């Protein structure tokens, strides 16, 4: 984590987004593990992923808050001229059977778009762990959709399978007027290796129209 923090700070970001899966094991679920996050040079916003649920989502959120991370729980904030919506882990809609893991609560991206996401004058950025429900977010006027979850497949042939499972498996996509980016993540799940994908720290520059 210390190495990741150094690389992030070297990019001199204005704001940092973390789209979940901070932990996959309870053995390192402690403040000492997260201490390097205090050194980040910009505000960081986090939404929880399914792996965080494996070790206890509430515990993960509590620890992250103690090191200064802004944890978003299906809510909207404004920072650095952006309207930022952070969603808890949820399905795309009531018919979504491809979430792969049990979602948190009854909310769906479709229902949240009707209740929470209201396009204003600021660029609208949505953070959600699973890159699903893009059609609802685009219709709601979202400018940028940031997600993770897929690890890009991590290992061949899972890359090929993921490309067919997920609407946005990895990298940059455009859906109507919305751009979506799914990060492969800076770590791994299970075996500490990748074949056909690379770990990443994504740097984006947003420009006004």
Where do the model's predicted regions map?
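Soluble catalytic domains of enzymes that build or remodel membrane lipids, polysaccharides, and related
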Residues: 1-209
């Amino acid at each position: 984590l210390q190495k990741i923090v150094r690389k992030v700070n070297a990019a001199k970001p204005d704001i940092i987004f973390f789209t979940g899966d901070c932990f996959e094991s309870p053995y390192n679920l402690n403040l000492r593990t997260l201490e390097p996050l205090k050194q980040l040079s910009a505000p960081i916003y986090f939404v929880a992923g399914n792996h965080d649920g494996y070790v206890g989502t509430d515990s993960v959120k509590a620890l992250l808050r103690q090191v200064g991370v802004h944890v978003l729980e299906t809510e909207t904030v404004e920072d650095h001229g952006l309207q930022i919506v952070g969603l808890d882990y949820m399905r795309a809609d009531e018919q979504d059977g491809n979430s792969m893991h049990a979602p948190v609560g009854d909310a769906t991206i479709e229902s949240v778009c009707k209740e929470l996401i209201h396009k204003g004058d600021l660029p609208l950025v949505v953070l959600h762990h699973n890159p699903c429900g893009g059609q609802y977010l685009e219709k709601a006027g979202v400018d940028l959709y940031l997600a993770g979850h897929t690890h890009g497949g991590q290992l061949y042939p899972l890359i090929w399978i993921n490309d067919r499972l997920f609407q946005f498996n990895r990298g940059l996509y455009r859906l109507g007027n919305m751009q979506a980016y799914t990060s492969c993540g800076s770590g791994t799940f299970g075996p500490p290796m990748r074949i056909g994908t690379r770990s990443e720290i994504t740097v984006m520059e947003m420009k006004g129209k």
